[in-house]
């Protein structure tokens, strides 16, 4: 049966990538359908109950700046908020929130159900319709066909998913959910490179059986941050602490003695796991010199007894998991509610994607999330947003859009994936960005909200608030420029208490704020520079933009130099075989990756500066040398 209505965009999957991918085109005015195997698990946190962190918090802010949902949802569901790296520079400061799983899922579902232009339908998808090399719809398990002008696939770990606990394994997309086996088989028939990855999750513990009295507490920040630029502390639910315990030699001995029952160490699992979130087995073996590892006991919500022991992800047998848990301080009598497990799943080589996340092989088919080789809710959501935007733009007949590396961490993420590919689950870090001083959490809206407005992703309220913030920043910077302190000023004594070396000549408020020891808050407590802005976001921008002005300008100059050829396009039909000066290795890599620009080509492993020069000369010779907006 063919459904009577033709959609502009169909999104398959209702996880973190799928929800953002569905909301974006709906906000842009396109008729959108979200297909999920279970509407009750929309926005489900399959692993750790947290959003944000180093690099990840930056992505969440970018999603929010573009009108996405994740930041708003966690502001309504976060039960502990912290600013990480708060003592370091603004480039690496990051917001992290512990989440109440139920509240988060409720926030996501409410947003989806109240979004105009978005329909939701519960059915497992078993096939993607492809006609004349273009995706035109999806087929569900009961034989119902939905037609569309573009399709976004966000299947997470469900494609041919296999769950491992000890030497036992079975098909599954995650605990309690079936694997998408039929869809995986169908996708393997398409002209796309497929491989396997692995991830894992720890056992869940019964809080009633944990001796919290002997454990160290970890509280959130006294001054609670918010994740969304439109957020408010008033949205946060009740805040509660986490607790900390540690593994010990007994724990490690048990793990070492059980490796013959580990699916990883016996070769049953073939997929590669996440480097930066290893299983406890991996940690014990890779860091054999350490006799202890810190484990965070994170509550899964305000209305549940489940606790997530962050740091003991494992696929060891259940009896070994019990031994691991009971070997740790405070957990001697703790019960396990859900066993930990590892899961293997299909993913597609992201080098087969355009930077818009459309597949190169099939027009109108977009991939987002873990099926592109990433790990993490935030990475998935950022991809979902980008894929949804471009699926919509394609239907509208408009030019595609994606952020560059100097504009957003989303740009770093996508460029790394599409240019270099990945053989292990990829996660974002601030260290992956060349221009991280420009890609801060605090300025994500300044970088991206005007673009979101042009694309039709944000409402009038957000746009008005953004413009008011920009006016506040400009007005305050100008005000501080105009206020001067002279050596004879009545305020000199107070100002000298703020600075490391007394003033010997006149200085403006801007001059003073450039000093490392002077903060905006301290400066505006001086009567001459009062009052401070009520708008805390604008005040933060004033301080950072003044204090780091020289460094920011230096990075912007670097970007301009780099951009001279970054955006030089390489036509899809460019024939590398005709470029005789290229080595066979370079030619083979360029033909394999098919970079869309000189900038992308330059980041492919093994592509030398000399090869880039040869490419530029040949593009010019063939009359193909042109720049594009990437």
From Swiss-Prot:
Location of this chain's protein in the cell: Cytoplasm
Keywords linked to the UniProt accession: Cytoplasm, FAD, Flavoprotein, NAD, tRNA processing
Binding sites annotated in the UniProt record for FAD: 13-18
GO terms classed as biological process: tRNA methylation; tRNA wobble uridine modification
UniProt cross-references to Gene3D superfamilies, sorted A to Z: FAD/NAD(P)-binding domain, GidA associated domain, C-terminal subdomain, tRNA uridine 5-carboxymethylaminomethyl modification enzyme MnmG/GidA
Binding site for NAD(+): 273-287
Pfam families: GIDA, GIDA_C_1st, SAM_GIDA_C
Lineage: superkingdom: Bacteria
InterPro entries membership: FAD/NAD-bd_sf, GIDA_C_N, MnmG, MnmG-rel, MnmG-rel_CS, MnmG_C, MnmG_C_subdom, MnmG_C_subdom_sf
Gene Ontology CC annotations of this record: cytosol
GO molecular function: flavin adenine dinucleotide binding
Cofactor(s) in the UniProt record: FAD
Subunit structure of this chain's protein: Homodimer. Heterotetramer of two MnmE and two MnmG subunits.
Similarity field: Belongs to the MnmG family.
Function as written in the Swiss-Prot or TrEMBL entry: NAD-binding protein involved in the addition of a carboxymethylaminomethyl (cmnm) group at the wobble position (U34) of certain tRNAs, forming tRNA-cmnm(5)s(2)U34.
Protein name as it appears in the record: tRNA uridine 5-carboxymethylaminomethyl modification enzyme MnmG
Organism: Actinobacillus pleuropneumoniae serotype 5b (strain L20)
Lineage of the species this protein comes from: Bacteria, Pseudomonadati, Pseudomonadota, Gammaproteobacteria, Pasteurellales
